[in-house]
Amino acid sequence: MASRKTKKKEGGALRAQRASSNVFSNFEQTQIQEFKEAFTLMDQNRDGFIDKEDLKDTYASLGKTNVKDDELDAMLKEASGPINFTMFLNLFGEKLSGTDAEETILNAFKMLDPDGKGKINKEYIKRLLMSQADKMTAEEVDQMFQFASIDVAGNLDYKALSYVITHGEEKEE
């Protein structure tokens, strides 16, 4: 008869296995396919795992060659083990589960729009994002603005941006 300790270990391993297999139920089939494509692009040596060299090569292919080893190590440490596709999905599942709902994002923007016009000056938002809380870089803010609707007066349509942030695409009128 197996000892209690052995049974407990086996049960924990099964629970961990079930938890990682449930990650697929957190995503739609199309999302899983998109993640698989991204994983395949990053797995440069095609061994089924993303390692430090794969990350370096991926960054290089994006034109960023000055990534430090400690930055890559920090990325890899976010995973609890080797990064195969299931682990890759787990990591994204954890990141995406922290994404604010559209209403929460809208409410945050509304705090900066006392007149309720649905628009905020782009330069004002940029200054806030680069100087408050989790400070963003100018590059990160500019990337975000690529998905924003900005009028000729330089005002950001935050309702449209909130939709893009939470749904990944512009709302069709």
Swiss-Prot record:
PROSITE patterns: EF_HAND_1 (PS00018), EF_HAND_2 (PS50222)
Tissue distribution: Expressed in fetal skeletal muscle and retina.
Pfam families: EF-hand_7
InterPro entries registered for this protein in UniProt: EF-hand-dom_pair, EF_Hand_1_Ca_BS, EF_hand_dom, Myosin_RLC
Gene Ontology terms: biological process: regulation of muscle contraction
Molecular function terms from GO: calcium ion binding; structural constituent of muscle
GO CC field: cytoplasm; cytosol; muscle myosin complex
Binding site for Ca(2+): 43, 45, 47, 54
Region Disordered, annotated ranges: 1-20
Location of the EF-hand domain: 30-65, 100-135, 136-171
Keywords: Calcium, Metal-binding, Motor protein, Muscle protein, Myosin, Repeat
Subunit structure of this chain's protein: Myosin is a hexamer of 2 heavy chains and 4 light chains.
UniProt miscellaneous comment: This chain binds calcium.
Protein name (database record): Myosin light chain 5
